[in-house]
């Protein structure tokens, strides 16, 4: 039986009037909303243990305060966080990310500290007298407008911030030949059956063949040849192209992009072949640099399993293991039975569990060569539209218990360089739909962990669309050198 988490590590005196306390805290959360928005427009992103507060309602902010109990043993109160946010709002800071949750917990655990002096010292290197931005924001182009292309569009628009560091300038796609092509593309971006309504406004500009997305004019360019796209006509220079088509995966094919004089580099949203670097942000992104002309962000499954494997190998040393991915269907499968060149995939995706192969084991060996020959993998496609599950069964060198494995992942999720990559769940009722639009590469399910001496099985959920797209954007920001510094530093 898995030991349940005790949420009452840090005790507080109970309030006499629960409703009165709630209304007080709700009012403070409501006051936070405009402050968070104002800071965002200045390039400052406010977080609560890694979760962004931007575009959150007052109730969502209160839920994020409650979430902190999963990390620290008790929730935070808006009474504790509001003064910190208010002080930050009065400071003149360079663009950065500030986790007010981590700041407040540090203050609560070190009551001798003067809060104003601590915050001032913590953010000292970010103080400025005037803004320092590049003369021109870096241009980004998305090549392809399918599932990943549209989700990337949503993320890039939402992360634009002050708009001084980078901008999504264009989307390149094949011309459907339909008179209302642009209107239909806007409709697909505006409403998504899995991820819901777009959080903002989308206007169609037929004259310029562009969409105005939350104030960002994004040109739609029709082409089927990367070398011949006339980016110059749209004043696009030294662009980074994100190729989400999957049509070209080797150096010869992807180099078509960089042969275009307006393109500086290309980032592939699929596993790259040959000598192309496959990068999983948080694990081997140190091998990616602004000098690379072609990079690949590997696959959604690779991004989900590699951080978990590295963490276990670093702490317990993997002898061997097997990975079974329970993967939501994709548009590569057939809605009803029909011909498909791959075995079994011709059968209806909506009606069957489909056993299929996966390149996950080979991908692991590319990124973690120390595990070459130690890992096998297979996949089962299931009739759900989104969110997948990696079941990782491993033999490790020494005996290890469930609590030790869980604590290893908990620390990684909240206080390591993997905190942007790994999420941690304590829920005893978690199911796949709970993780729609989850921002992390994987969510470690602590309640499902099994250990039998040196045999360990862990379960990792992952949004194979949104979580993966977030990883792509993290890698993009790294190679563009526009990642925001995060405070307080670990």
Spans of features found by a protein language model:
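A generic transmembrane alpha-helix motif of multi-pass inner-membrane proteins
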Residues: 452-453, 464-466, 476
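N-terminal Rossmann-like NAD(P) cofactor-binding subdomain of oxidoreductases
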Residues: 2-334, 342, 474-475, 482, ...
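Glycine-rich phosphate/pyrophosphate-binding beta-alpha loops
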Residues: 381-385, 461-468
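A generic structural signal for alpha-helix starts
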Residues: 303, 399-400, 466-467
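C-terminal substrate-binding/catalytic lobe of Rossmann-fold NAD(P)-dependent dehydrogenases
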Residues: 2-62, 315-453
